[in-house]
């Protein structure tokens, strides 16, 4: 009976996915659930889905604590899994080696706040402060607070974030090189006006505590807001921010070389004095001169004379901007030169990927950010793969796309766009295209198996023959059948990397599946896990082992150390 109970406690049920295919769903196993949670931590605007992920994270922490207290698991297993869950917070927010997600990271913070407020506060501290680059930036203060207020939780965390920001401002006001904290302080007349008042009241708390009457308190509050405005203005002048020059009608003094990747990306049309359709915005001399400076800079970038920062731009935003430039016929504009240059700079964070092929899901369920991210990730893989610049798109019908004639990012997007987008998800047809080519060319087993097949998708594929089971089982069986067809000996499948780009409740594989990986998110950073892995190592890898490798980055050791101290 005990064996049956244990089997049920660790059982992973199956379900029918959105388009009729068999898939795994949320598991009863703690370890399986941790990997599944990570796999579904991909950007979404669906509040109900985020709430579901919050529930799963909460259940995992609750189950771990209960199992440890009732002696169902040893201390080592308890601490190990708690450490993974805590490091997952850092990885989810990390803009350097992780997923770079805001809302999902705040959701995980809120869950940890429910279980351990000290650890939640420490994790947030790592978002904004660190010996190296923090996981996020000072921008996280206002957005994290907004999330907590909307979900009516985290008051201690909110107070701590306010304390951290104001302490940094006190350091910056006397520092020769201030941080960017002041840049991200919300303005009084903005959507974050209530937070501005809280920040000002905290910074000048002595004004308010000395007030003895309602009238004097009102005056003290007014003075605290006025002085806080002056403080932020002084620090921003010290930082010499773009906004200061724009507000001062000194656009021509904005230096193109000093712009951050995000500022250049978001304001390139403003700097160039252009509308989206390429028309001039204004004839003001200051704006025209500014545009001239940025046009010259863009021209130098196009010829390779200078670089334009692009590492912090989301891959989905690259594709979105490229499609917009294509739509308006602006592929040869200065805006296009800037976007292409930023793509080149962004690509520096991804190493050579060996023999990897990208399969891009361009079906209707991927529309919007998931599709844009899939296209950009697929193009990044094509550029870095030893096999050459090729991608396979799939929707109603697959298309093998040769990108050799494309000399920049926008031209690659334009070429891929000619495939059929927005239809159903006929993954079987895409897989058969690969297998038919293998048969036609009579490829040897080593040529078939020695590669990574990366499926960039939401994994909601069309119904296949039920005998094949899950998506991974389908792939393995189809490769085995092809080997038998050619050589009377089954092929091993190549290493399959399932890269999830839309949060659902389905899973293509179990955590213990050999020769497979399960990643997710819009950041290319996790691709680097495959830069040094040979095929022998990959064939023995499982989704769990690759996940643990990703979470074991030195950047997250500080979280593990703090958790061990807290739970000692």
Feature roles, as predicted:
Residues 1-373, 383-568:
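Long lumenal/extracellular ectodomains of secretory and single-pass membrane proteins
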């Amino acid at each position: 009976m005990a064996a049956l109970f244990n089997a049920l406690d660790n059982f992973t049920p199956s379900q029918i996915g959105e388009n009729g295919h068999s898939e795994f769903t949320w598991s009863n196993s703690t370890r399986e659930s941790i990997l599944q949670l990570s796999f579904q931590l991909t950007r979404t605007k669906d509040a109900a889905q985020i709430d579901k992920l919050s529930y799963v994270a909460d259940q995992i922490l609750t189950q771990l604590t209960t199992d440890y207290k009732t002696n169902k698991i040893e201390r080592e297993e308890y601490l190990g899994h708690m450490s993974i869950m805590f490091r997952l917070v850092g990885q989810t927010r990390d803009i350097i080696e992780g997923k770079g997600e805001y809302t999902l990271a705040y959701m995980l913070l809120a869950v940890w706040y429910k279980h351990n407020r000290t650890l939640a506060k420490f994790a947030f501290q790592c978002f904004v402060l660190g010996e190296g680059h923090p996981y996020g930036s000072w921008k996280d203060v206002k957005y994290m607070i907004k999330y907590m207020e909307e979900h009516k939780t985290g008051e201690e965390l909110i107070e701590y974030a306010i304390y951290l920001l104001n302490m940094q401002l006190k350091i910056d006001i006397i520092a020769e090189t201030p941080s960017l904290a002041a840049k991200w302080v919300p303005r009084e007349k903005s959507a974050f006006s209530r937070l501005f008042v809280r920040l000002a009241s905290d910074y000048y708390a002595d004004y308010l505590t000395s007030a003895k009457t309602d009238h004097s308190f009102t005056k003290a509050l007014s003075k605290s807001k006025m002085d806080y405005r002056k403080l932020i203005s002084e620090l921003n002048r010290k930082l010499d921010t773009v906004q200061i020059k724009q507000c001062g009608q000194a656009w021509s003094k904005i230096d193109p070389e000093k712009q951050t990747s995000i500022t250049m990306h978001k304001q390139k049309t403003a700097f160039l004095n252009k509308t989206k359709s390429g028309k001039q915005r204004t004839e003001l001399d200051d704006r025209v001169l500014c545009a001239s400076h940025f046009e010259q800079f863009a021209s130098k970038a196009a010829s390779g004379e200078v670089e334009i920062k692009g590492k912090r731009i989301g891959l989905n935003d690259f594709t979105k901007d490229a499609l917009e430039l294509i739509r308006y016929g602006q592929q040869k504009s200065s805006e296009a030169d800037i976007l292409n240059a930023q793509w080149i700079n962004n690509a520096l964070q991804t190493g050579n990927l060996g023999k990897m092929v990208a399969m891009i899901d361009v079906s209707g369920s991927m529309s919007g950010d998931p599709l844009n991210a899939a296209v950009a990730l697929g193009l990044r893989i094509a550029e870095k793969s030893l096999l050459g610049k090729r991608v396979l798109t799939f929707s109603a019908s697959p298309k093998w796309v040769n990108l050799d004639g494309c000399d920049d990012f926008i031209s690659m997007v334009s070429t891929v766009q000619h495939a059929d987008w927005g239809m159903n998800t006929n993954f079987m047809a895409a897989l058969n295209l690969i297998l038919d080519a293998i048969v036609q060319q009579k490829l040897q087993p080593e040529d078939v198996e020695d590669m990574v097949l990366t499926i960039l998708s939401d994994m909601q594929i069309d119904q296949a023959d039920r005998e094949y089971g899950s998506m991974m089982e389908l792939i393995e069986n189809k490769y085995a059948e092809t080997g038998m067809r050619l050589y009377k000996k089954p092929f091993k499948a190549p290493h399959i990397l399932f890269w999830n780009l839309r949060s659902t409740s389905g899973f293509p594989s179990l955590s213990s599946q050999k020769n497979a990986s399960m990643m997710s998110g819009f950041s290319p950073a996790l691709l680097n896990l495959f830069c040094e892995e040979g095929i022998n190592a990959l064939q023995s890898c499982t989704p769990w082992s690759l996940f643990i490798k990703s979470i074991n980055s030195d950047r997250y050791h500080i979280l593990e150390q703090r958790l061990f101290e807290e739970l000692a």
